[in-house]
């Protein structure tokens, strides 16, 4: 958001696009700029230059937040870049995007963290990890992401995430009652 403010102060007229995981606040901050909000649904639990993957975006869904004010030329240019990178476009309202990524991405980070913590606190943690197979690896993969990056991803959407975590807790309580 700070960068968008700076671009406004210098009357920047070029295209501004982002790849952030939350759209609605940026859309407000970018008013008056040739802004196209994007979010490639591709990533890795790894970080740093050595983790780069030239095929990361191939066949990846790429959310593009379009509103009436979106400059059509800027939109076309961004769509062209996404297609060149191998992604496929998913047009989406910014609010709908933010609510959907809570379910498809942000919740997974929180659940994986809670699951890993529960396993780690068990007296059987060491043996459980030794016996862990694909299910454990699949569920905990994102916990190896840098904590700072995970916080940056989920924090801007914390209100929606909190609501979804509450719903998950209710569902877990129902399952617990069935046991």
Where are the regions that the model predicts?
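Structural motif
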Residues: 1, 19, 65-68
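Interdomain hinge/lid region at the active-site interface
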Residues: 125-179
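Residue-level detector of flexible, active-site-proximal loop/helix-junction positions
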Residues: 23, 42-45, 69, 96, ...
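Short, flexible, solvent-exposed loop/turn segments with mixed acidic/basic and small polar residues
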Residues: 50-56, 151-152
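Rossmann-like NAD(P)(H) cofactor-binding subdomain of soluble oxidoreductases
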Residues: 3-50
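Internal alpha-helical scaffold of NAD(P)-dependent oxidoreductase catalytic cores
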Residues: 54-142
């Amino acid at each position: 958001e700070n960068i968008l403010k700076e671009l406004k102060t210098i009357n920047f007229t070029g295209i501004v696009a982002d790849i952030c995981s939350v759209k609605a606040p940026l859309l407000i901050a970018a008013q008056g700029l040739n802004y196209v909000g994007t979010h490639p649904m591709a990533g890795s639990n790894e970080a740093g230059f050595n983790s780069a993957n030239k095929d990361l975006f191939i066949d990846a869904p790429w959310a593009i937040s379009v509103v009436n004010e979106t400059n059509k030329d800027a939109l076309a240019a961004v769509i062209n870049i996404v297609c060149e990178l191998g992604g496929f476009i998913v047009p989406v309202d910014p609010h709908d995007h933010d609510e959907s990524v809570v379910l498809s991405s942000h919740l997974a980070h929180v659940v994986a963290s809670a699951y890993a913590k529960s396993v780690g606190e068990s007296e059987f943690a060491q043996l459980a990890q030794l016996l862990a197979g694909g299910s454990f690896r699949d569920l905990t993969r994102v916990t190896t992401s840098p904590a700072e990056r995970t916080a940056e991803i989920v924090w801007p959407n914390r209100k929606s995430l909190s609501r979804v975590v509450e719903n998950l807790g209710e569902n877990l309580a129902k399952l617990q009652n069935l046991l």
